[in-house]
Amino acid sequence: WVNKGFDRMQSSNLSHIEMMKLLHQYIDKWSPCIWTTWNGFGFDFVLLQKESYKSLLPIYKTNLGGNEHCDFLPVARASKLFFPDCLNTDISEKKNPIFKLDNLGPRNFPDLDKTKMHTAIQDCETLLRVMKKLKQSKASQIYEASKLTTSKLSAREKIEKERVFTTCFYFYGKM
């Protein structure tokens, strides 16, 4: 089911709860792992929790039991703030960098198949390539630091241990 296309889903007759149970089976199969997203804290993780709740399934499946969350959108934003040349971005009318995957992909990886933009598989490929680019750039220290805060426990330990801890917040296109 994962990345097999919308056609397969349309031709099946799964109910919402059957689909959610199947998704939870995949989560169990792949766990424990670090669930990595682009804007997951703003969309993916929230959606999964709400739909799991509606289906009477465990709502924190992807961040308990050894699982952790990582959202690379804030990592990319922080990297661009401190190392402006690490990613090529277009600029919005309000003079802010644009961090949409279907914009970042072609700007940074011209060989991407543009016919697949904003599909699950293309978003995954673009996310992976952005992560690799950040890891291999001057922003690698931000990339590495992001891995230290993928769980509540590790984030708390890091914050309590360090004398200085920096985080970046993003509001309406501004850091």
Write out the residue ranges for each language-model feature:
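Short, basic/hydrophobic alpha-helical segments
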Residues: 16-32
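Metal-dependent phosphoesterase core characteristic of DEDDh/y 3'-5' exonuclease domains
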Residues: 1-6, 11, 27-140, 145-149
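Acidic two-metal-ion nuclease catalytic site recognized across multiple nuclease folds
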Residues: 132-175
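Extended hydrophobic/Leu-rich segments
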Residues: 1, 22-23, 120, 159-161
